[in-house]
């Protein structure tokens, strides 16, 4: 344990916060264009075909983003909106596509949690 004198000479340094979404560049959302839409499999012990897209952002960065909800209409050259938020069982996927914005349609027939999936009240 340091003495008061040592702390006066050299104060404690707080560790720098790591940025988990560097491509967003301190923005809450960013626009991008899909360069590839595909499915990938999660880490053990999970098993599925998760829908993801490689997206070139307006800042020039290329990221992999998850497409949430059941069914989607995305294809190459679709314009999408990206937010932060990783998918725990997909390594390298640190962004989510926002449903119901730009070319992304909302989830059809969604009754609960509609605001998260861009679904209109039916």
Curated annotation (Swiss-Prot):
Query: Where in this protein does the record say 3-methylthioaspartic acid is found?
Result: 89
Pfam families tied to this protein: Ribosom_S12_S23 (PF00164)
Which controlled-vocabulary keywords does the entry list?
Answer: Methylation, Ribonucleoprotein, Ribosomal protein, RNA-binding, rRNA-binding, tRNA-binding
Q: Which GO terms describe its biological process?
A: translation
Is Ribosomal protein a UniProt keyword of this protein? yes
Question: Which InterPro entries does this UniProt record tie to the protein?
Answer: NA-bd_OB-fold, Ribosomal_uS12, Ribosomal_uS12_bac
Task: State the GO CC annotations.
Answer: small ribosomal subunit
Q: Which residues cross the membrane?
A: none
The molecular function GO annotations come to: rRNA binding; structural constituent of ribosome; tRNA binding
Q: Which family does it belong to?
A: Belongs to the universal ribosomal protein uS12 family.
Please explain the role this protein plays, according to its UniProt record: With S4 and S5 plays an important role in translational accuracy.
Assembly, per entry: Part of the 30S ribosomal subunit. Contacts proteins S8 and S17. May interact with IF1 in the 30S initiation complex.
Q: What is this protein called?
A: Small ribosomal subunit protein uS12
- Gene, per the UniProt record: rpsL
């Amino acid at each position: 344990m340091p003495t008061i004198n040592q702390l006066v000479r050299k104060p404690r340094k707080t560790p720098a916060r790591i940025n988990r979404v560097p491509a967003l560049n301190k923005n809450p959302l960013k626009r991008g264009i899909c360069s590839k839409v595909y499915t990938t499999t999660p880490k053990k012990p999970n098993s599925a075909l998760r829908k993801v897209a490689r997206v070139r952002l307006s800042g020039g960065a290329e990221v992999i983003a998850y497409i949430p909800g059941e069914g989607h209409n995305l294809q190459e050259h679709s314009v999408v909106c990206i937010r932060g938020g990783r998918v725990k069982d997909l390594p390298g996927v640190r962004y989510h596509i926002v449903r119901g914005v730009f070319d992304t349609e909302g989830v059809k027939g969604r009754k609960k949690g509609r605001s998260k999936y861009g679904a209109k009240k039916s």
